[in-house]
Amino acid sequence: MGKVLIIGAGGVGTVVAHKVAQNPDVFTEIMIASRTKSKCDAVVKAIGNPNIKTAQVDADNVDELVALFNSFKPEIVINVALPYQDLTIMEACLKSGVNYLDTANYEPKDVAHFEYSWQWTYKKRFEDAGLTAILGCGFDPGVSGIYTAYAAKHHFDEIQYLDIVDCNAGNHHKAFATNFNPEINIREITQNGRYYENGEWVTTKPLEIHKALTYPNIGPRDSYLLYHEELESLVKNFPTIKRARFWMTFGQEYLTHLRVIQNIGMARIDEVEYNGMKIVPLQFLKAVLPNPQDLGENYEGETSIGCRIRGLKDGKEHTYYIYNNCSHQEAYKETGMQGVSYTTGVPAMIGAMMFLKGLWKRPGVWNVEEFDPDPFMEQLNKQGLPWHEVIDGNLEV
């Protein structure tokens, strides 16, 4: 049905490659590209499909990307590289006439700040080129938006309150490790919190607001209010929302390590001089922390991510909770990666599938909740991320 190029051979890229290879009726030709070609070759070896091509590319270099795109001629690029590289890859797609999908919005390397505005400005250029760009097609962002669109389509006339809840109840048996790129992860959770209420954004101190929430099959966990990028698009696309928040669980040991990292200056993203060299402390820390790709083998427990929604249907107030639980061990057995990589990589593959099937094909730049959620929801059940519903239960929020 179509040729796909995956950029990035980390944990998420590895999962995307496995899942793409499992669907040969949709993805007829596959290439994996990364700054380090040997990482791509290792992914292909693990999958056991010698027909998957690999290539070396610097995703910060538009000319290199254009040369690769023009050579392989993919119909769609799945960008699971770093968020810093979103704009160079989008530029290369426009120059080469290639469609685009990513899992995280752009953020500049020198400022710990992320928002969709940089990518939304590409809308007219993609429209004029007749190309589709699908933004934020991981789990959160991604499935969280699709869950919201599904709820709006089937369960509510008006969504008023949205709480996205993300729990990782797994144990990787490390003193401290992040589940995806440490640099991106630590930048995200050390920023101020932010939530939307009554038409305004309310800013909080980092991890200032927290409460215990109960997660299916897991139980109560301390959950902390963070700012997460999908809130920005969801309140725009569902203007009836009065309040939208995002919650994530952290254990006390993790938070203690995080405080120490900040207090000793290792979370800094500016350059410091060391032995006559310029280094960024957070990038150095990333080099000595466990690689998220290596956590899967001994990872136990599961993730639970969902949307808790309150709103009106036929004039009456209702609640709706939709979620997925994902086992780290099952994810590892299938792809060699842990559940956090799995829950991001599977939706990215499904989004590309939706495009190649013509179901999510529309010139412009779009967030996932702007498409029909139904065929995507059907594939979640088939591809390893089954969802569950609780109607008119206690949302706790």
Segment roles from a protein language model:
Residues 69, 75-79, 100-101:
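N-terminal Rossmann-like NAD(P) cofactor-binding module of classical short-chain dehydrogenase/reductase
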Residues 36-38:
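Helix N-cap at the beta1-alpha1 junction of Rossmann-like dinucleotide-binding domains, i.e.
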Residues 153-397:
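C-terminal catalytic/substrate-binding lobe primarily of soluble NAD(P)-dependent oxidoreductases
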